[in-house]
Amino acid sequence: MKSELRFQLTLSVVAVATSMLAGYAASETAPPSLASPDSFASIADTEARSAALFTELGKVLTHPRCTNCHPAGDRPRQGDASRLHQPPAVRGADGHGLPAMRCSICHTNANFEPGRMPGHPEWHLAPREMAWEGKTVAEICEQIRDPARNGGRKVEDLIRHIGEDTLVGWAWAPGGVRSPAPGTQKQAGALVDAWVKTGAACPAK
């Protein structure tokens, strides 16, 4: 009986160790890169070049690190598989959760690696009108340049928002076994800058 228990414990330890190693390997995997704005210089038509720049940026905007917090409903999603958040948190009136379950209860000022808990001082869901989950890159483009659906921003404001905002920047340093968004925040900001300067055109639907 003791030997059987010992065997079961050994199997459990091996399973946990294997899971941890797999998670570590996943966290060490380099994210896909982003093409630089210069890569699109050969596109002579300015509008077509602008649309191509946004299509490249779309690799970031449609990544789970972004769409999980820009959900179609009132519940955030989590993980690379975009599962519904557990425990079942909901948006609340201000995007920071319900009075009894504020986002900040679990999501503190920084990532908490022992618990694989993401964190940032302003952790919250994007407003409903900024939902991207399930949308095409073209649909997100039309939305993100519309002040009524982008938080009241001009397209020029998006350069700093995507390129410098620290909550947005969390997507490139998510911790745990979460895959980071493609490229770097600086590269994403450069794409937004080039997109705006070429007229902020959107890809064809």
Predicted regions and their residues:
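Post-cleavage N-terminal segment of exported redox proteins
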Residues: 2-52, 64-68, 72-77, 193-205
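Generic detector of leucine side chains in alpha-helical contexts
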Residues: 5-11, 21, 34, 53, ...
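General "foldedness" signal
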Residues: 23, 71-74, 80-83, 117-120, ...
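Electrostatic cytochrome c docking/interface patches
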Residues: 39-60, 76, 80-96
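C-type cytochrome heme-c attachment and multiheme electron-transfer modules
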Residues: 48, 55, 64, 117-205
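The canonical Cys-X-X-Cys-His
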Residues: 65-73, 100-110
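Gly/Gly-Pro-rich "capping" loops immediately C-terminal to redox-active cysteine motifs
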Residues: 78-104, 113-145
